């Protein structure tokens, strides 16, 4: 799922120093393959079906909270995915399976463009998040483009917002240079070193292309490397209004 606006944003969630022998060393980070295996179960696909079989739409999502006792899982996705004019049924499909679980809409906002859905009788691991990103950080986007199989795309943080220390190189992530397409809205943006969630895909910029033979017919294509992200900071504020504090990962 992804909104596109030509030429504009297409709308679519500390290292500790150790001193040894007079030298400062950083703790060893886990291998990226291990990090990836840890975050994959938290990435899901969302599907919506219109009543009466009038078509379907797709988006991506990320698990932000769970309750193992009551077997409940809360999933974050893009707000515009659930903003359909006609009633729709929402389903969640987990990574690596064809199983579908019916979901209930809990909350949706336009600013930020986020939605929270609840799935019963399913327990998935929630992600941990980090609100500060750094320019050049390696990131992963785990999405289900065009409603198909899971895709892992890599890139870097290319734009951050103003942080509390006014450091131009760090702050809430705003843009990454990872290329995404329709169906990636709501996908988690993860730090590739730690697996922490630093944001959620909102959309991508598009360009209009017309052919000489049919100038009235315009195609909109994603602009490579201009993916807009809702920061983990904005995700935290959104979740704080959803009464999930007891179920969020510490």
Where in this protein do the model-derived segments appear?
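Bacterial N-terminal signal peptides that target proteins for export
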Residues: 1-11
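Bacterial N-terminal signal peptides
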Residues: 10-20
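Short conserved beta-strand and strand-loop elements enriched in small hydrophobics
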Residues: 46-48, 87-96, 137-144
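Active-site region of chymotrypsin-like
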Residues: 40-47, 59, 118-126, 151-238
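Active-site substrate-binding loop(s) of clan PA
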Residues: 34-35, 62-66, 104-106, 118-149
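A conserved glycine-rich beta-strand in the N-terminal activation segment of trypsin-fold
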Residues: 29-32, 43, 47-75, 101-102, ...
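Catalytic-histidine neighborhood of serine endopeptidases
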Residues: 66-111, 121, 212-214
């Amino acid at each position: 799922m992804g909104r596109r606006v030509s030429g504009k944003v297409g709308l679519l969630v500390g290292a500790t120093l150790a001193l040894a022998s007079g030298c400062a060393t950083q703790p060893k980070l886990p291998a990226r393959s291990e990090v990836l295996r840890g975050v994959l179960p938290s990435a899901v696909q969302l599907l919506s079906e219109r009543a009466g079989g009038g078509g379907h739409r797709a988006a991506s999502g990320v698990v932000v909270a769970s309750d193992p006792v009551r077997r409940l899982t809360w999933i974050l996705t893009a707000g515009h995915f659930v903003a359909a004019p006609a009633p729709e049924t929402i389903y969640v499909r987990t990574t690596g399976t064809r199983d579908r679980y019916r979901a209930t809409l809990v909350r949706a906002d336009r600013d930020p463009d986020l939605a929270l859905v609840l799935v019963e009788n399913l327990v998935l691991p929630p992600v941990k998040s980090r609100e500060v990103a750094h320019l050049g950080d390696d990131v992963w986007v785990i999405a289900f483009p065009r409603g198909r199989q899971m895709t892992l795309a890599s890139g870097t943080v290319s734009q951050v917002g103003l942080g509390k220390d006014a450091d131009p190189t760090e702050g809430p992530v705003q843009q990454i240079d990872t290329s995404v397409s329709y169906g990636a809205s709501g996908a988690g943006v993860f730090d590739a070193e730690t697996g922490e969630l630093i944001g959620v895909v909102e959309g991508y910029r598009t360009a209009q292309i017309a052919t000489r033979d049919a100038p009235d017919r315009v195609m909109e294509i994603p602009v490579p490397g201009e993916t807009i992200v809702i920061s983990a900071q904005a995700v935290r504020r959104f979740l704080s209004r959803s009464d999930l504090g007891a179920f969020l990962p510490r």
